[in-house]
């Protein structure tokens, strides 16, 4: 069912109200009160619509209406409420006593809206005009005539900075490819440091092997010369192998795998790595001077037997580093050349006691 119209349109007056029409409306409402707007035009003798009479009374003729200019406080309230409520003027009018919604709407359109635009603020969104230009761009892009390149540009520009993919990923890949070796395998920094440490340990182990092999060979020669069983042939490699393998077995528990591999690569039994050729020839040459007086050698250390025993132990069991640093090749040749004379001296002096590390030799010489 449709709503019945308040009045018939025939013969009704439209346009501005005259002063006579205002007096008739004021006197009727003053006598009968508000309400019944459909019957008021006929009862008051007005050729107006009932709606027109209501709006004229509410917005202009009502005595409680506040007239005059809006204050600065009222302007701020209107701007704040319009930013949150929009064009709902009746809601805004509730927060401004004695002000009508029509008056607030007219004041907004004639004064406040223009003032905000002069300040660079969008009167619709209440934001700066520069940032409010994006919606127009989006509307143009949503049209069917927009190209794909424009849409892609708008997406990249509207994307937040943190959500964009980092451009440094390609640089990281290029750095990894630069670090790769010629055959295509990547180089790792940890493997390089391990190789450096392995080289240092291998060089140190080789030096220790050489010194240890020389020390064991000198001890074997001294013990054999004291027994008088040293042959005229060159010392075989088997004697070096026995002494060297025992030393390696004792050190296997405390050494790591890299040191064992390094010892396996190095051949400690080759004549070139242990002794030069002139040293081996010197050890095999046993035509020593028989007239050497060894009693003079021990007399310079003292007259008592205790000092003689300590001096011999110091000579025979000296540290390996001392032999390498202080004993030259010529000194070793002289010492080896006098081994047979020492054995004769030991046989003549029955009070001398000698202790050796080898299990195959006797503990004391009498």
Curated annotation (Swiss-Prot):
InterPro entries: Homeodomain-like_sf, Myb_dom, Myb_TF_plants, SANT/Myb. Pfam families: Myb_DNA-binding (PF00249). One of its GO terms (molecular function) is DNA-binding transcription factor activity. It comes from the Eukaryota. Expressed in generative organs, mature leaves and trichomes. Residues 37-61, 89-112 bind DNA. GO terms for biological process: cellular response to sulfur starvation; defense response to fungus; induced systemic resistance; regulation of DNA-templated transcription; regulation of glucosinolate biosynthetic process; response to bacterium; response to insect. Disruption phenotype: Low levels of aliphatic glucosinolates and decreased repressing effect of brassinosteroid on glucosinolates. Induction: Slightly induced by glucose, gibberellic acid (GA), jasmonic acid (JA) and salicylic acid (SA). Transiently induced in inflorescence by mechanical stimuli such as touch or wounding, including herbivory-wounding. Up-regulated by sulfur-deficient stress. Residues 130-146 have a biased composition (Polar residues). Residues 124-170 are annotated as: Disordered. Residues 147-158 have a biased composition (Low complexity). Keywords: DNA-binding, Nucleus, Repeat, Transcription, Transcription regulation. PANTHER family: F14D16.11-RELATED. Major regulator of short-chained aliphatic glucosinolates (GLSs) biosynthesis. Together with MYB29/HAG3 and MYB76/HAG2, promotes aliphatic glucosinolate biosynthesis but represses indolic glucosinolate biosynthesis. Prevents insect performance (e.g. lepidopteran insect Mamestra brassicae and Spodoptera exigua) by promoting glucosinolates. This is Transcription factor MYB28. It comes from Arabidopsis thaliana. The lineage of its organism: Eukaryota, Viridiplantae, Streptophyta, Embryophyta, Tracheophyta.
